A protein has these predicted regions:
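C-terminal accessory helical subdomains adjacent to catalytic cores in phosphodiester-
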Residues: 1-12, 27-51, 69-81, 85-204
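Alpha-helical scaffolding within the catalytic cores
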Residues: 63-68
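Phosphate/oxyanion-binding active-site loops and adjacent basic polyanion-contact surfaces
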Residues: 21-25, 53-62, 198-202
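Conserved beta-strand elements of the Class I
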Residues: 14-18
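Conserved residues at beta->alpha junctions
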Residues: 19-20, 84
Length: 204
């Protein structure tokens, strides 16, 4: 099959993002792309079909990116980004995904440990100011009860006043994106590792 070309923006570098979350990452990156427009860069966030919405494994997200790559004719400077969480996924699975990413020049993995909410929280809170016990709470990201939200979602709600993974004010966070980048870099003690082994996020 002849691959299609995305003619509408082929003069621009293309950045394609596929994420593990159903809504949280999509809301954030769409707002970010709208706020930081650049005629030489086009950001495309892949949507999931209804059949795919409950399949969030890193392997499935990688498959989604590969399907896109095989369907469209990409240029040498285009980038494909896999945005996933450490959460419950095994090191063996993440290693397989990371290995495949390193075999493709255009493919990159941005993993958050424990989850993407860490990246959001770094916009408005500096993890360097936390006590060791608080840092442990962030990393463990536990629920107080079976039906409660994980710790970082609760923390975001406390800091923002209102937060739900499918509806939140991403622009309020993006106003502090430079702070988030600086804080994420400070957390990344071993940037040569394929993903953060401790509290950290490579979304920066």
């Amino acid at each position: 099959m002849i691959r299609e070309r995305r003619e509408a923006y082929r003069d621009a570098r293309l950045i394609v993002i596929a994420s593990e979350g159903k809504d949280t990452e999509r809301i954030y990156f769409k707002a970010l792309a709208k706020e930081y427009t650049n005629p030489r860069v086009h950001v495309h966030i892949l949507e999931r079909s209804e059949d795919e919405r409950n399949n969030s494994s890193p392997e499935h997200v990688l498959k989604q990116l590969n399907n896109y790559k095989n369907q469209y004719e990409l240029e040498a400077d285009d980038e494909l980004w896999l945005v996933v969480d450490k959460d419950r996924w095994t090191d063996a699975m993440l290693s397989r995904v990371a290995t495949e990413c390193t075999q493709e020049v255009s493919m990159h993995m941005a993993l958050s440990n424990p989850c993407f909410e860490l990246w959001l929280l770094l916009h408005i809170e500096d993890s360097a100011l936390l006590t060791p016990e608080e840092q442990k709470q962030w990393m463990e990201n536990r629920r107080k009860s079976k039906n409660a939200d994980p710790y970082l979602k609760v923390r975001l709600r406390q800091k923002m006043g209102s937060y739900h993974e499918s509806s939140y004010d991403a622009l309020a966070l993006i106003a502090h994106v430079e702070d988030a980048i600086e804080r994420a870099r400070a957390l990344d003690k071993n940037p040569a590792d394929r993903w953060p082994q401790t509290l950290g996020t490579r979304v920066y």
